[in-house]
């Protein structure tokens, strides 16, 4: 009988020689197991975009009405309250139609998030919020 992909993954993860060459355990193992078994589909089914691109002076936003699935990459996600950009609107629209529609967007819960929150606040012309979040960032870095 053919070994299942899950069993192969567990077996490979138990092999120290294989694991020593992996950077991202789950992704790398799947890439090895599925090598040659993958069908590449149109990018509209996995459009990747970082909301931190919004911090740049200029960037190309690949999100449009043709996109089926957006994979928000990077530390800032559309469920963060500081991700207030048109590029986050597909998520907000889906959230509003979901059982989580009344849940608040996430506030910064660690120093890394506080730093990104402050950067986005300044980009969005919210300097008071930016200063407050930089103070919070330093508090989390120094005190905690």
Predicted stretch roles:
Residues 2-144:
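A glycosyltransferase accessory/donor-loop signature
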């Amino acid at each position: 009988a053919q070994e299942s992909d899950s069993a192969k993954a567990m077996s490979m993860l138990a092999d120290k020689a294989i694991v020593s060459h992996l950077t991202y355990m789950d992704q790398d193992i799947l890439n090895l197991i599925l090598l040659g078994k993958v069908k590449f589909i149109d990018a509209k089914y996995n459009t990747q975009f970082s909301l931190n691109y919004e911090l740049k002076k200029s960037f190309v936003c690949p999100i449009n009405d043709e996109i089926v699935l957006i994979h928000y990459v990077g530390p800032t996600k559309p469920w963060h309250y500081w991700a207030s950009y048109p590029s986050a609107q597909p998520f907000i629209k889906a959230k509003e139609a979901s059982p989580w529609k009344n849940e608040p967007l996430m506030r910064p819960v660690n120093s890394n998030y506080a730093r990104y929150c402050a950067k986005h606040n300044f980009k969005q012309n919210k300097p008071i919020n930016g200063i407050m979040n930089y103070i919070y960032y330093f508090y989390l870095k120094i005190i905690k």
